[in-house]
Amino acid sequence: LPSRGLGDVYKRQLNKNIRVLEIGTGSGYQTAILSKLSRFVYTIERFKTLKLFSESKFKYLKLNNVFCKHSDGGLGWPEQMPFDRIIVTASAPEIPLTLLNQLSADGIMLIPIGEENNDQDLIKIKKKGKKLIKKKIMNVRFVPLLEGKENK
């Protein structure tokens, strides 16, 4: 997401008091940025090699507020909920209720919604108690959010 020109979204939506759930650690670049802008970052990666690679970088950089998990991102991290922010770096055909249920009462989720190999909408979902406020931010193209985890 940083490469998508969302610097202003980060600045307005993150602060040192919040807990972030990131779905899709990848190289850990975005995670490292999030760690400097929030209190805790819980990040899930479905590929074991990527999780181990990025986790070693976090240790080297002494990012002690980052916690990594090798798992199915669509399941979230229920043991650590609720999250003030959830950032999903893979597209889903619709908003995953499992993740939405892990969002705090005033939380915000950023997620690309749409079909694989097509334009998708990056959606900002703000939870106000039991009410959801959805806003399209921009058109994007992300890899799909896949079920399960890979041991490679």
Which residue ranges define each predicted feature?
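Single conserved hydrophobic/aromatic residue that forms the stacking wall/gate
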Residues: 1-10
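Conserved nucleotide-cofactor-binding alpha/beta core module
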Residues: 13-132
